[in-house]
Regions:
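Short catalytic/metal-binding and nucleic-acid-binding patches
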Residues: 1-189
Length: 189
């Protein structure tokens, strides 16, 4: 397991899982990827937070944020989701037909209504969730090795010498799959 030097900030450190409506693979689309990147930067500029780790998969996002003291992550996710949805439609994106209750609330079929959050409580908790983020594309069968997935902070952590490039690489015959059993109740997947 990598050796993390810093894991929390003043307002808390949180792991999030954000899922698209009905698990639509919206983020297979490069336009959606770019819109999400743009919207996150916009929201960060007005409502600062630090992204410690993130992975973008076709139908969901996992990330770890450091929050400012006494601040609100729900506001940030609401803004990210709503701004993304507006820009997604403005750029020709579509949504999925939604239930009557969603229609009554003027909700679109882009995001699941809520998100999953977990307060990181220790260095070990941080490390396990960060490992989960970086291993997630392998878990879902998109790649054999974390370094093969470009939509992840794994590469930044390798560059900073926190992870070796061949970390949990399934190309390595001696590599054991990680066990995330002890955090399964905190990942929301």
């Amino acid at each position: 397991m990598p050796d993390y030097k810093r894991w929390f900030g003043d307002g808390g450190t949180y792991f999030f899982t954000i899922i698209t409506y009905d698990r639509r693979k919206i983020f297979d689309n490069p336009i959606a990827q770019e819109i999400l990147h743009q919207v996150i930067k916009e929201v960060q500029a007005k409502h600062p937070f630090k992204i410690q780790g993130i992975v973008l998969l076709p139908d969901h996002i996992h990330c770890i944020w450091n929050m400012p003291q006494d601040d609100n992550y729900s506001l940030r996710w609401r803004l990210i989701k709503s701004k993304f949805t507006k820009l997604w439609f403005a750029n020709g994106g579509s949504d999925k037909k939604v239930s009557l209750s969603r229609t009554k609330r003027s909700e679109r079929g882009v995001w699941q209504r809520r998100f999953w959050e977990h307060l990181i409580r220790s260095q070990k908790d941080f490390a396990k969730h960060m490992d989960y983020i970086h291993y997630n594309p392998v878990k879902h069968g998109y790649v054999k090795c974390p370094h093969q997935w470009k939509y992840s902070t794994f590469h930044r952590w390798v560059k900073n010498e926190i992870y070796p490039e061949n970390w949990l690489c399934q190309c390595n015959e001696n590599c054991k799959k990680p066990d995330f059993e002890n955090i399964k109740n905190s990942i929301g997947e």
